[in-house]
Amino acid sequence: MLNSFAPPFSLVAGYFCAGFLMLIAAVFAFLGADFDVLISFDTAAFFHLFFAGFVLSIIIGALYQLTSVVLEKTFFTLKFAYVNFALYLFGISGLVSGMLSQKVALLHAGGGALLLSLIYFGLTYLLSFLGARKFNFATISMCVGGIFLIIGVILGFVLVLYFAAGVGNLPFETLLCFHIYFVGGAMFFVILGVASVLLPMFALSHKVKFYLFKLAFVLFLCGGAVLIFSIKFGAIFIGFGAFCFICDAIYALAKRLRKSYDYWNLNIFAGFLYLAISAVCLWFGMVKEAVFALTFGFFFAFIVAHIYKIVPFLIWYHYISPFVGKTKVPLLEQMVDKRAAYVALLLNLICVLIAACGFVDIGVYLEIGALGFVVLNLVKFMSYVKFGSEL
């Protein structure tokens, strides 16, 4: 199925590599952000580098591959996919540069390019669901995620116009709230759907029904409806939805057949710990510390955990599997530098704990070290692309 429906690995790898480049830039942007003024251009630049640059780039790359697997059919179209990737890079780079330099023309150009790129991807992604062989929780959740993405980026461009040109008498705080809700919801629903497929696969816990995932789905939608009347109560619904997701994910990991711990499940457990630390910091008004634990803690650990599983898997099937029976081929686990993975995990843990104690800048610099060890593994993965070339 993978070989029948898979898009070119170069497209998926392009988004992954771009995501990590954006992450490196986000580390430095964090140092210049003012989290006491969350709507400042410097702060907005960091959030867009991290979420629209790193997180969304990884998600798009993964969706090009995983959508075909979940739906058991080819992605709707790959025409102009590479052009769209270039447009995405120009868009996010221009938008962030416009924010940092406060140049209206660059802000408009970058925001417009990013809007077109994400809408094109969102539409081709949603059209992939037409004629799907399976229609279950995973497909519904992933489809809703695509709808949320399109709505979210449109609201985001309206905010760009508001910032850059002061368009009309728009309710800025309401627009910002729903922009965050829809873009965050796109990520949340995609993660819900994909996790309901990947968690049983990677953890070998096939008897989990994911009832709390479904409750999380409903609570997040209800949270959006409540946001219209009250941001506070809407956030409570969304928070409970996220809590249900975490509980079910932990339950699935607890029910795994192989009880050993490795760089994958340890990163996931650490990610949930960082999310709890972020919530505690926010409760005590430590906004900068909370943002660090959420971004470079939870999201970083959660994404890296799955990178360790997904990228070797894709490279093995695209570049190594044709040589099975012809020469000795590596196992998936042999493709991962375990020492580098565990050092990155340990450094990331130290970073978050130090930052939570108030030494955020030190945590940021140490995070560069953790990121470096993750990149070492990425380089090792990519070296297998040339496997068998000497035969």
PLM region descriptions:
Residues 1-391:
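Hydrophobic alpha-helical transmembrane segments of multi-pass integral membrane proteins
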